[in-house]
Amino acid sequence: MKKKSFGRFISVDPKICHGKLCFRGTRILVSDVLELVANGLSWDDIIKECHGSISRPAIAEVIRLAGLAIAEHADDYLERLASV
């Protein structure tokens, strides 16, 4: 796999963080930030937690892309939940 960009703020590079989605120019995992959002941290607190390496527009982009992924794969997720 080669380096790919998703939107303005997200990239994946097999040489960085084992090829997991990160915020461009950082080693901050998208999944970690989504977890912080899910745990109720404010966006300002998330930005502080990430030492200012990400921005509000970057967090918004991640949430939008997560929403698109859920919408695209909703049937798969429902099947997985039903089998648990």
Report residues per predicted region:
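Long, charge-rich, low-complexity alpha-helical segments
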Residues: L29-V84
